[in-house]
Amino acid sequence: MLKTLVTDVDGTITDRRRRINTAAVETIRTLVDAGIEVVLASGNTVCFMDGLCKMVGTDGTIIGENGGVYRRGFSGTLRIPGDQEVCREAFKVLNDYFAGKGVELELYSAQYRFADVAFARNIDPDEARAIIRDHGLPVRVLDTGFAIHLQTPGVSKGTALVELAREMGLSPSEMMAVGDSENDIEMLEAAGIGVAVRNAPVRTLSAADWVSEEGYGDGFVEAVKKYYPYLFSR
């Protein structure tokens, strides 16, 4: 039996223009009102996630910065498995390299991040990976489709899901995860049921146990409708 739903935000409970899908929000509220814990998981910052949790109506249990941080409830201890120092070092290397080519890297929410470094998608992530590799830095370059993130290897939404499940007294097999991007793959694989919405890339679709017919927030609603009667029973 599934007891908790973990969902990505951008591209999963939004529309293609990153506007929140109101049907997805109503679905989340229905789950919360039924006593099912809903965890929001994103590459975004803790402060962004806190505001979203308040407005949507969840209890503040989050996975942020692509697994670099996670927390049980608004009053819980913020866990930070990511190592931001090495990510900052990697960003400096990239910034110096691309500045030499006349390209400026625009940081995203740097003052609000605890574990990773995020910046605009105006460079080729494969080129960034090659530069990081040439400098021997232990940093993962992650392209979420919304930003490029520099992250500690071995840290992902999937590892955060496993650790969060332990704090909640659950097994990862008792969690359902929904996502749309390559940064959701580990999360879908770690959960008992992993669902990809139709707009996901091929690698993410292949990692999922089930794929919705609809994309974006409508696909999220479809997924919950499919699994709710059978798996979220009490």
UniProtKB/Swiss-Prot annotation:
Reaction(s) catalysed by this chain's protein: 2-phosphoglycolate + H2O = glycolate + phosphate
List of catalytic residues: 8
Pfam families recorded: Hydrolase_3
Required co-factors: Mg(2+)
EC number, as in UniProt: 3.1.3.18
Example of a GO cellular component annotation carried by this entry: cytosol
One MF term in the entry's GO annotations: magnesium ion binding
Positions that bind substrate: 157
Chain ranges passing through the membrane: none
Residues given in the record as Mg(2+) binding sites: 8, 10, 180, 184
Keywords, ordered alphabetically: Carbohydrate metabolism, Hydrolase, Magnesium, Metal-binding
Function noted in UniProt: Catalyzes the dephosphorylation of 2-phosphoglycolate.
Family membership noted in the UniProt record: Belongs to the archaeal SPP-like hydrolase family.
Name of this protein: Phosphoglycolate phosphatase
Natural source organism: Methanoculleus marisnigri (strain ATCC 35101 / DSM 1498 / JR1)
